Amino acid sequence: MLKDIGVKGQKRIKAAKVVVIGVGALGSPVIQYLAAAGVGTIKAIDFDEVSLENLQSQVLHGTRDVKRPKVASAKDKVKNINKNIVFEAVKEQLDASNIEAEIEGYDLVIDCTDNYKARYLINDACALHGIPLVFGAIYQFEGQVGIFNLDGGPCLRCQYPSPPPAGLIP
């Protein structure tokens, strides 16, 4: 246990409820580390299935997971890391009709998606509900990370009012 966290801090981590949206190259290690840290409740949302091409960059999945939903693969791996975690696997495409219900009641949302349409959808719902948002993006050897909606701070849309032009990354 990290000395600056202590028992009190670990209890707070165990009580935390986190949503991870996107279980690919970024979401895979995020989920692994949340589980290893002892986060008590993790909800993973992704509509996709594991493909052979995913395996080099999506470390949560293996060859036995090909053609399985990414969220089902993630649930199996998390239960091997920490059987006491409450893990909800949600295989669906998020849109305006379901995003709010999926994040309501959670302490933190981590956006591991790969497009600005999804990022704005997630951001807007988090801002509306006052839920902190950690945004991460990776592309090849480049990446970005940011924290939004924290203690009344700015949101993703405040920082990026419109999506970047096509071809710019991440």
Q: What is the meaning of each model-derived region?
A:
Residues M1-P170:
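Adenine nucleotide-associated cytosolic modules
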